[in-house]
Amino acid sequence: SNPPRKAILISAFLAAVGHGLRYFLMHAHLFTMDIATASFFAAVSIGLLAIPFAKAIHCPAEVFSFPSLLPMIPGMFAYKSILALTKFMQTKDETDSLRYLVDFCHNGSTTIFVLFALVVGAAVPVFIFHRQSFTATRLLKKLVKKG
């Protein structure tokens, strides 16, 4: 696919909205969410906002939503889990190895849950509004066939 240059600006806008929403949900004073739940709601909001933009520019909603999710990938949790795994394999002390194993499981499960929440959260709006996301590219296909 060859998306227009406007897609970059829209993706950046959606990424800022999603990341800001996730930050707000994790740090609000009335209620606080864990990173996986907040990432799910942020991904749903990105997916919902991508559908009107897709209709306006005649591109698939995934062109906007997938790049917008990239800043929310939990790289630090993934790095800490791999670091704990390598330290676990290198240590000889039993208490340290237990601590590294717990760190690996905690950071690894957090990474997996956040990634799962991002994928499901971005896919839910596309499945719910399948007709709207499908018709966003229909006009473009008709124009290509006529030309």
Feature names for model-found ranges:
Residues S1-R5, G20-M33, L101-D103:
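Short juxtamembrane and helix-loop transition motifs at transmembrane-helix boundaries
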Residues F24-H27, M33, T37-P60:
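Transmembrane alpha-helices that form the ion-translocation and gating core
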Residues F53, I57-G147:
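C-terminal transmembrane helix-loop-helix hairpin of multi-pass membrane proteins
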